[in-house]
């Protein structure tokens, strides 16, 4: 349907190694001008799963319990939004859609004190965002505030007008004498898929070099390059910095 986009939820049988695949199609690349994103999670534990979260309102001060997506491990609590949107599967009532694929990354960047894993962030964003850009902002700001409890991820964000692709990984923790991580959060880069193009990702970081002054088409963590330098992973002026190769 024109200007509406389609979610193609593909559940595949378990393979020897878990894998996810996302296919992203911009408006100009589809016959009827629809944005389309497919998300395949090759996991027997999620086969046939279709999440439903009804629209709701909450009293001020309500807290949201966070449990890791999949294992169900309790991670902590964050303030609940006063208003949330309907969510079915990986899409909400405003046709904001989020998919993912996991690529792991550096073990030393794991924050054992973090509260928000990627799965929880996906569904929190779907409950709160009206656009793909807003979902990116919510995802990254919450990760910075409460800590990112997952490994490296590629995330698809879409709405009826735009499709975005983001690579993200947690920052290397720095614990003070009280055991508090003073360097929580994540570093990330998000690229808008140009209209008329398609893209895909499957368990591999894909964003290499990226434009630094094009906010309509590229968003990124302000410390993505400086963090790599601090960790001894990059030397340079930033012009040749590649997220995926670092």
PLM segments and residue spans:
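Second-shell loop/turn segments in exported
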Residues: 110-112, 120-129
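Generic detector of short alpha-helix boundary/capping microenvironments
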Residues: 7-8, 83, 123
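Sec-dependent signal peptide recognition
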Residues: 2-10
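A contiguous strand-loop segment
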Residues: 20-118, 138-246
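N-terminal signal peptide c-region/cleavage motif recognized by signal peptidases
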Residues: 14-16
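N-terminal start-of-chain detector that recognizes signal peptides
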Residues: 10, 69-71, 127-129
């Amino acid at each position: 349907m024109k200007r509406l986009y389609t979610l193609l939820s593909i559940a595949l049988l378990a393979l020897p190694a878990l894998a996810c695949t996302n296919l992203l199609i911009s408006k100009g690349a589809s016959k009827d001008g629809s944005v389309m994103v497919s998300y395949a999670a090759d996991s027997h534990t999620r086969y046939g799963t279709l999440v439903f979260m009804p629209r709701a309102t909450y009293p001020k001060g309500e807290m949201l319990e966070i449990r890791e997506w999949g294992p169900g491990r309790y991670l902590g609590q964050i303030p609940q939004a006063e208003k949330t949107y309907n969510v079915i599967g990986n899409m909400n009532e405003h046709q904001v859609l989020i998919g993912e694929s996991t690529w792991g990354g550096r073990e030393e960047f794991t924050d054992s004190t973090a509260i928000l894993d990627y799965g929880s962030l996906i569904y929190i964003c779907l409950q709160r965002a009206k656009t793909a850009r807003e979902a990116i902002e919510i995802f990254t700001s919450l990760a910075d505030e409460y800590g990112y409890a997952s490994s490296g991820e590629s995330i698809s964000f879409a709405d009826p007008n735009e499709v975005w692709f983001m690579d993200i990984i947690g920052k290397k923790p720095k614990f003070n004498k009280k055991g508090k991580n003073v360097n929580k959060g994540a570093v990330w880069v998000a690229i808008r898929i140009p209209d008329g193009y398609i893209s895909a990702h499957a368990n591999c970081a894909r964003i290499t070099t990226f434009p630094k002054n094009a906010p309509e088409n590229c968003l990124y963590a302000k410390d993505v390059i400086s963090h790599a330098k601090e960790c001894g992973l990059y030397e340079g002026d930033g012009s040749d910095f590649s997220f995926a190769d670092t």
